[in-house]
Design a protein with these regions (language model features):
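Flexible cytoplasmic inter-helical loops of multi-pass small-molecule transporters
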Residues: 92-110
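Selective transmembrane alpha-helices of multi-pass membrane proteins
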Residues: 67-96, 156-164, 175-203
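Hydrophobic/aromatic residues within the transmembrane alpha-helices of Major Facilitator Superfamily
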Residues: 15, 19, 51-52, 88, ...
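Alpha-helical membrane-protein architecture signal
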Residues: 8, 12, 105, 109-117, ...
């Protein structure tokens, strides 16, 4: 019963974590504007990344980052560089219409890679899985509990972000976002650059 209660608590914490806006939310909604399919694939990729982070947390991410300082620094710099690059790319292509020959909806593989990379370099993920999440997982829990934790991380994240992709690509919402594509991409790109800059400035 103790393990079941812990799983329920972890599920609640996971739901609060994915619901808070951040790079993951920005990338899935902006991708869904270009293509519903690509947006949903991005959502599943974010879910896969959550499962990866859960596995890393179970393996002792918090202890590693705490005792080997350069690993945390390297993760922060890599994440910041990727977010800045992605943000700059979005701003540069913000005014390109989606039906232009030079710009097409991302392929499934491209959407999956982008979603996974954004989540794996997301500072929120490092902080969440390296601290709160890792602390909530009992040290000597059985194997089935660890499997359940990873499954919950994948399920909660996939459900939320795929839901956001479907919402953003709903005809009414999609038309509104398409009319504001240049503004949306510029704002999201700018926010990603700001997030990356804050990561670089952090100590």
């Amino acid at each position: 019963m103790e393990y079941i209660n812990t799983l329920l608590a972890l599920t609640g914490v996971m739901m609060l974590s994915v619901a808070s806006p951040g790079p993951n939310f920005m990338i899935v909604t902006s991708t869904a504007v270009a293509s519903r399919r690509a947006g949903v694939i991005t959502g599943f990729a974010l879910g896969a990344a959550s499962g990866t982070w859960a596995l890393i947390a179970i393996a002792g991410l918090g202890l590693i980052v705490t005792h080997v300082a350069w690993i945390g620094t390297a993760l922060r710099i890599a994440g910041a560089a990727y977010l800045i690059w992605l943000g700059a790319k979005m701003i540069l292509t913000a005014r390109h219409p989606l039906n232009a020959p030079t710009l097409v909806a991302p392929s499934g593989w491209t959407a999956a890679k982008k979603g996974y990379a954004v989540s794996m370099t997301n500072p929120k993920a490092v902080a969440f899985y390296g601290s709160i999440f890792a602390l909530m997982v009992p040290a000597h829990a059985p194997a089935w509990f660890h499997v359940a934790v990873i499954a919950i991380a994948v399920a909660v994240s996939s459900a939320w972000y795929c839901g956001m992709a479907l919402l953003a690509s709903h005809p009414a919402v999609h038309r509104l976002l398409m009319r504001r594509k240049a503004v949306l991409d510029s704002v999201v790109g700018g926010l990603l650059i700001v997030l990356g800059g804050r990561m670089l400035a952090a100590r």
